[in-house]
């Protein structure tokens, strides 16, 4: 093997290894989550860690952000944040969505095809159920939800918010 080929192989190994470590690193620790954010999970810690590993292994964090962090540096995709998503959708909805062979039929996207939510129908049923349970557990404190809705209303209408 030539010297240049060896260097290229080492570079590839570093990139692949770094990507794998990044996916392991994105399983948030309690310390990282405890930043005074208005988001929380209702799952027991052991279940949450198991679900976070599924989220990480299925590259959800490549596009979606969570716990006030950013999505992976590997892709720049305008995917929705997952913080508080369980305050909007329930476990049954998430399970149906993750089980669909065509998630676009349930929740259409205007993103380019390569950035659209992939189907997770081929995952084992237990994994989809764990992910759905976890996503449904991601709540947002009521005061924050009210303030967010108020800001969105005022932004869209230009009028003061009146519940």
Q: What residue ranges belong to the model's regions?
A:
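C-terminal capping alpha-helices of c-type cytochrome domains
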Residues: 3-26, 92, 118-157
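Electrostatic cytochrome c docking/interface patches
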Residues: 30-56, 70-71, 152, 157, ...
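Gly/Gly-Pro-rich "capping" loops immediately C-terminal to redox-active cysteine motifs
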Residues: 52, 65-99, 114-122
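Protein kinase-like catalytic domain
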Residues: 64, 98, 102, 136-139
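Non-transmembrane interaction and regulatory regions of membrane-associated proteins
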Residues: 76-77, 102-110
């Amino acid at each position: 093997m030539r010297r240049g080929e060896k260097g290229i192989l080492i570079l590839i190994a570093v990139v692949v290894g770094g990507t794998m470590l990044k996916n392991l690193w994105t399983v948030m620790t309690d310390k990282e989550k405890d930043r005074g954010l208005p988001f929380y999970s209702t799952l027991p810690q052991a279940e949450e860690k198991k679900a976070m590993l599924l989220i990480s292994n299925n590259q959800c964090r490549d596009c979606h952000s969570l716990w006030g962090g950013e999505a992976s540096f590997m892709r720049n995709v305008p995917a929705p944040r997952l913080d508080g998503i369980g305050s909007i959708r329930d476990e049954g909805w998430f399970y149906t969505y993750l089980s669909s062979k065509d998630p676009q039929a349930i929740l259409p996207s205007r993103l380019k095809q390569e950035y659209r939510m992939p189907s997770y129908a081929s995952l084992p049923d237990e994994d989809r159920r764990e992910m759905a349970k976890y996503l449904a557990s991601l709540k947002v404190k009521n005061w924050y939800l009210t303030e967010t809705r108020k800001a969105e209303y005022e932004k869209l209408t230009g009028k003061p918010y009146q519940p």
